[in-house]
Swiss-Prot record:
Positions of disulphide bridges: 80-159, 111-116, 166-352, 245-264
Positions that bind Ca(2+) 1: 110, 113, 115, 117
Species annotation: Solanum lycopersicum
Sample GO molecular function, one term: heme binding
Family: Belongs to the peroxidase family. Classical plant (class III) peroxidase subfamily.
UniProt name for this protein: Suberization-associated anionic peroxidase 2
Keywords recorded for this protein, A-Z: Calcium, Disulfide bond, Glycoprotein, Heme, Hydrogen peroxide, Iron, Metal-binding, Oxidoreductase, Peroxidase, Secreted, Signal
Any single biological process term in GO: hydrogen peroxide catabolic process
Length: 363
């Protein structure tokens, strides 16, 4: 009898265990369904493990720390570059105020021909390479090359192991020149590359000329994706600096109504200079005031008042210098981001006036 009771007790225990197993399986299965098929386990506190959420947080924290560290290093490097260039530019303008306008113009003449690629900085090589410097719009006209060379060397000396293109340095120099002369500063993003060539004929065909009528000017700026308003704003760069008498005070280039303002010798030598407005060392709105009074020096400037749309922008800038300065800064950012020609061979030049030894300059 006792033996039978033992067997019955054992059978009941086995049934109970089986039922418990079914219950556990059912609860686990339901938990999986409720959690989109993911089995959530409670890990015993005496096991030296971390839950997946904690692991993810640690990974994200590590990534953020690495990202913050990289960003901090990048900002430090960029700050070094900006400081090195600014020191050279400020010194150059202190020595010669006109240099500020020259650096702004140099940047414009670089970017407007096949994008901001430093092509204008390449020296000619006798018999093998003719670049943009001696193209008619630039010959004996664009200047400031020595300042860019000094700024490049300053970056090399002050910011070791930082590779910055000559095109970037030129963009920074133009921005700092504008600020130095009283214009509105703006952000210059780094990352441009230097071309291994330049475009002699492109400088002739793409750059605006003093003799261009309004239709031609609008087309040239439209080709670079500038609006008419941006074109009129960028023309305001002529509120600072000088131009050669032989360029602006000759028939076809000069505004006939303002020709008497030309303070040039009878021979019109390249050393004779004509200021472009009455405050050539200050970035202001006087240029537009002069246009409204039909006293713009260059023909291409004065024709801006000959069209209802462009004349409206001239009046806007003449009436509100703040609007002009804001529009000019925005247009300079856009110009400074003009990309190099598709398929152009690019590098970061060691010396701005020549391609690296591994490259070969070509027309």
């Amino acid at each position: 009898m006792g033996f039978r009771l033992s067997l019955l007790s054992l059978a009941v225990s086995l049934v109970a265990l089986a039922l418990a197993g079914v219950a556990i399986y059912r609860n686990t299965y339901e938990a999986m369904i409720m959690n989109n098929g993911s089995l959530l386990q409670n890990i015993s506190p005496d096991i030296d493990s971390l839950e997946s959420g904690e692991v993810s947080i640690l990974i994200l924290n590590d990534k953020k720390k690495n990202s913050d560290k990289y960003l901090s290093q990048q900002l430090t490097q960029e700050s070094c570059v900006f400081s090195a260039v600014k020191g050279v530019v400020d010194s150059a303008i202190d020595n010669e105020t006109r240099m500020g306008a020259s650096l702004i113009r140099l940047h414009f003449h670089d970017c407007f021909v096949d994008g901001c690629d430093g092509g204008i900085l390449l020296d000619d090589i006798n018999g093998t390479f003719t670049g943009e410097q001696n193209s008619p719009p630039n010959n004996n006209s664009v200047r400031g090359f020595e300042v860019i060379a000094q700024a490049k060397q300053s970056v090399v000396d002050s910011c070791p192991n930082i590779s910055v293109s000559c095109a970037d340095i030129l963009a920074i120099a133009a921005r700092d020149s504008l600020a130095k002369l009283g214009g509105q500063t703006y952000t210059v993003a780094l990352g441009r590359s230097d071309a291994t060539t330049a475009n002699f004929s492109g400088a002739i065909n793409q750059l605006p000329a003093p003799s261009d009528n309004l239709t031609v000017q609008i087309q040239k700026f439209s080709d670079k994706n500038f609006t008419v308003r941006e074109m009129v704003a960028l023309a305001g760069a002529h509120t600072v600096g000088f131009a050669r008498c032989s360029t602006v005070c000759t028939s076809g280039n000069v505004n006939p109504a303002a020709q008497l303002q030309c303070n040039c010798s009878a021979t019109l030598t390249d050393s004779d200079l004509q200021q472009l407005d009455t405050t050539p060392a200050v970035f202001d709105k006087v240029y537009y005031d002069n246009l409204n009074n039909n006293q713009g020096i260059m023909f291409s400037d004065q024709v801006l008042t000959g069209n209802t749309t462009t004349a409206g922008f001239v009046t806007t800038y003449s009436n509100n210098v703040t609007v002009f300065l804001e529009d000019f800064a925005a247009a300079m950012i856009k110009m400074g981001n003009l990309p190099p020609s598709a398929g152009a061979q690019l590098e970061i030049r060691d010396v701005c006036s020549r391609v690296n030894p591994t490259s070969v300059a070509s027309m």
